[in-house]
Each structure stands twice: as C-alpha cells, then as structure tokens.
Amino acid sequence: MAFLEVNNICKSFNETEVLKGVSFEMERGEVFSIIGSSGNGKTTLLRCLNFLEIPDSGSITVDGEVIFPATDDQKKKVCPKKRLTFGMVFQNFNLFPQYTALKNVTLAMDVQSENELKAQGVKFLARRAAMKEAHAKNEETAKELLTRVGLENKMYNYPCQLSGGQQQRVAIARALALSPDILCFDEPTSALDPELTGEVLKVIKQLRDEGRTMIIVTHEMEFARNVSDKIIFMADGVIEEMGTPDEIFNAPKSEKTKTFFQKSNEEVKA
C-alpha cells in the first residue's frame, strides 16, 4: 500500500467541474510536481488535500488510514487533526502582518498546544500554567526552524520588513512547525521577483534532500525536472499524464502535454 492514495477526487463549484476524478499514489519521501496551464485544477487539488476545500467525492488515504471517506456525514465533519497530515505553503505567503516572523511560526504551535490541553480536559488555571511551558518550547522550535531556512537574523522582523523571498521562507518554517506528513506548495515562487526565486527553491531542495514528502504545484519547469521523483501534468481537471521527469519532459505521450511544452518553450524564447 502506498503512503498516500488519492482516489477519484471530484470537485465542482456551482455548475463548473474543476476536478473530474483525480487519482494517484505516492510513497513516503517522494516529491511530486504538478504542472499544467492555469485553470486546470492544480491548486484546487492541493486545497482538497488540505481540506481547505472539501471534495465532492473520492477518498484520501495516508499511511493506511482513510482520512477522507466520501460519505455525506464525513464530508461535513473533517476532523481538524486530519488537516495536520498536510502542510500548506501558499503563493502569497499569508503571514500575519501584525506579528514578527518568530510569532508567525510560533502561533500555530501555540494554538495546537491549547487545543490539546482542552481536549485533555485541563482546567483554565492549570491550562494557563501549562501553556507558558508549551509556549517556551514552541518558541525554541520556531527559532530552530527559522534558522534552518536561513532567517536567524530576521526572527524579530515584521513581514513588511522582509523581502518576498524571506516572507516565503517564514511561511515554509510555519508549515513545518506542525510536523506535517506531507508538505504542499502552491506555486511558491509565483509572487516573487526573479532574483528572489532561487532562495526559496534552495530551501525546497534542502527539504527534498532531508527526505520530506512533498507535492509542489509549480511553473518552474527546470526546478520540477531536477527536484521531482514524478511529474503530474494536469489538463481539464484530470491527470493527463504522469511519469518520471525524463518520461514527461523528454518523451511525453499525450498531445496535450506536448502542446503545453511547445507553448512553454515559445514563451521562454519570447
């Protein structure tokens, strides 16, 4: 059994079918890149995996546990803990502007600690004392993560004091803070100036080298080729073609895939 099994995921918005039965499997430690033209369901697929959108049908299984069975009751009651299976890095950073880089990373862990204490039935005063200890540990973890992404000298800066590349690295540290099984990136460099793209891609490559399981929606074709175990090409809400980077980039079988690369090459030359 594969580590992640996505089976026949469908999603519509009003009358528009965005995902039309998407299925794939991946093993722990693999990196998949999802490519394709805009408007073909790539971001919606990531949002469904993270339960930011609830699929209309299909199933998602992680490490043998079905975390999304498509029954009517369970579609409406996705356990928040299941969301922690996936971490999400958004293209527009989504940092809290009123908080420092350190607090942006610490905050999610503090919320998780608070929820765990409440679930254990810890009373208010005891919970307050326990949260002081938890916050101290969470802050140390946040400092370690920010150091890992090269921001040890920017921990107390606010987002407005950081470059786009630095903000995205804070967002990556925040996603790692909750120790997700699978880390998802939605076009992590699309909002960056070209000169800042490299610093973010370097961090993602470092995570790959550490054995992180990752799904990356990207328009960076050369990066996808170099960092990925498998490439998924999506078109019209389905997986049109899937294979190794060599298979997809050097010997695509689908006419839609071939056309996509032809247009991409023309845009690069232009």
Question: Could you tell me what each predicted segment is?
Answer:
Residues A2-L4, C10-P245:
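ABC family nucleotide-binding domain
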Residues A235, M242, D246-A270:
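C-terminal boundary and immediately downstream tail of ABC-type ATPase nucleotide-binding domains
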